[in-house]
Amino acid sequence: MLNSHSITIAIDAMGGDYGPSVVVPGAVKAAQITGAKIILVGNTPEIEDQLALLQVKNTKIEIVHASDVANMDEKPSDILRRKKNSSIQIACRLVKEGLANGIVSAGHSGASVACGMFIIGRITGVERPALASILPTEKNPLILLDVGATVDCKPYHLFQFGLMGHTFACDLLNIQSPRVGILSIGEEEGKGNTQVKEAYELLKMAKDINFTGNVEGRDLFTGNVDVTICDGFVGNVALKLSEGLSSSLSRVLRKELFSSGIFSKIGTFLAKNAFKNFSKLIDYAEYGGAPLLGLKGIFIVSHGSSNEKAICNATKMAVLFEQKETNKRLIDSIGLNEELTRFGHSC
């Protein structure tokens, strides 16, 4: 494993709902924990103000000025063409030029995907990138991909998502032989639309992955698979549905418990550790972000409402990616299955 002190991560300091006031403290904490060098990209005076408030000393923090910001109401294509001096574009160029190993951004997710693809570039052989989200289950965490990078997929795109998800699970979740499934409308082979059925056949023939077949939506959170693949449209709907459901259930549970009688309140007090553990389980900040797999550099896309903890954990994930040399293993896996990808093209 590579020494984290030799790793550099560029962070979009202007990204997210809160900008430098949250991103800078999270980045500083990550630098202190990992020992990695951090490049904060954004408005220099604003970043310096935050560093002064934190009284940062003896930490490997550098600032690269960006005079522009990618706004959430702008089209990704417009940001890519017109905002060359935006923090997201400059951070991506640092990775492309070899000045940083990876990037973390809580900014415009569409711009993140566009800039990642067209500035950093895709790994040779990778057709489309995929955003991989980590979700809680009854057992172990689940990797769901794609959750929004590629909404219109060919079967061979899904096939490559399976390869990339397998490698991610091996390296980041330390699973020796992750179980890979494809999201469909039934467990049995032959269920699903044409896209899913053709991808299923490719995945059955894949080298070095443990493909277990179809996964129904109701089984996503049972923990019976480690990686579930789907196109970015379905994946994003599934992700937002799970986030909304968990938030609603938490609010309903809290309301019922605290509006009931004295015995319910006593029970709530006795079970406070269980509720604390549950809250931690469904907190997206625990992992910090979703890696955009398939690029030549590391790119962690964080939630727009990320707090300091989320930024810190996203940065730690980027460092771990480089330490584990995950991209090299992705390249090996894509190369090993190159013939199947070509076969998928011909179908």
Swiss-Prot record:
PANTHER family: FATTY ACID/PHOSPHOLIPID SYNTHESIS PROTEIN PLSX (PTHR30100), PHOSPHATE ACYLTRANSFERASE (PTHR30100:SF1). Keywords: Cytoplasm, Lipid biosynthesis, Lipid metabolism, Phospholipid biosynthesis, Phospholipid metabolism, Transferase. GO terms for biological process: fatty acid biosynthetic process; phospholipid biosynthetic process. This is Phosphate acyltransferase. The lineage of its organism: Bacteria, Pseudomonadati, Thermodesulfobacteriota, Desulfovibrionia, Desulfovibrionales. Pathway: Lipid metabolism; phospholipid metabolism. It catalyses: a fatty acyl-[ACP] + phosphate = an acyl phosphate + holo-[ACP]. Its EC number is 2.3.1.274. Catalyzes the reversible formation of acyl-phosphate (acyl-PO(4)) from acyl-[acyl-carrier-protein] (acyl-ACP). This enzyme utilizes acyl-ACP as fatty acyl donor, but not acyl-CoA. It comes from Lawsonia intracellularis (strain PHE/MN1-00). One of its GO terms (molecular function) is phosphate:acyl-[acyl carrier protein] acyltransferase activity. SUPFAM superfamilies: Isocitrate/Isopropylmalate dehydrogenase-like (SSF53659). Homodimer. Probably interacts with PlsY.
